[in-house]
């Protein structure tokens, strides 16, 4: 339905649409560039912020699912609402993984706004997972001058896209309408 809506929009605009690509988000580029993460899958990568959590599940060497969860202090009966929200959402993502036939989560990588890493890891201890902080890629220099995990998404966006693994052309896979290919005026 969405693909067809874009087809109509581009047709109205009189534009020749050759492809609509979706792919990995910027943090996925950093995670997948580190080959040691392949051994940790299924792997959950969690972005922590005072207002949201970003959760990205990796399975079989690729990004499988991502969700963004707004959080606020009012939603939890605790001053430590970030830790509570993180615990709750890691548990949900583990249930999601298991519901799809997965083995459950053993490894979680954290990045973003991490005030007290030890406190956070201790709080996650009840989930029986190994938590770590997103490592700085070898090609990143000068990270001593800033907190890498806070800027990881922006840095990941600078990585060159791997066209072989990070491309899904929605025009080629639009099976719901029976339309495919990349020709035609204003098609999506």
Regions found by a protein language model. Name each.
Residues 1-188:
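Hydrophobic/aromatic-enriched cytosolic interaction surfaces used to assemble or bind macromolecules
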């Amino acid at each position: 339905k969405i693909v067809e809506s874009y087809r109509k929009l581009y047709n109205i605009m009189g534009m020749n649409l050759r492809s609509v690509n979706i792919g990995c988000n910027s943090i996925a580029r950093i995670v997948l560039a580190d080959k040691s993460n392949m051994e940790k899958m299924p792997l959950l990568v969690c972005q922590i912020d005072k207002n949201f959590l970003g959760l990205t599940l990796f399975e079989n060497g690729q990004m499988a699912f991502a969700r963004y969860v707004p959080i606020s202090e009012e939603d939890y009966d605790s001053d430590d609402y970030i830790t509570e929200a993180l615990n709750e959402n890691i548990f949900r993502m583990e249930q999601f993984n298991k519901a799809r036939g997965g083995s459950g989560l053993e490894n979680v990588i954290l990045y973003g706004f991490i005030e007290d890493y030890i406190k956070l890891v201790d709080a996650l201890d009840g989930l029986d997972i190994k938590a770590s902080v997103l490592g700085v890629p070898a090609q990143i220099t000068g990270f001593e001058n800033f907190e890498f995990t806070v800027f990881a998404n922006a840095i990941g966006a600078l990585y060159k896209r791997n066209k072989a693994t990070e491309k899904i052309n929605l025009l080629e896979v639009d099976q719901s309408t029976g339309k495919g290919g990349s020709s035609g005026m204003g098609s999506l």
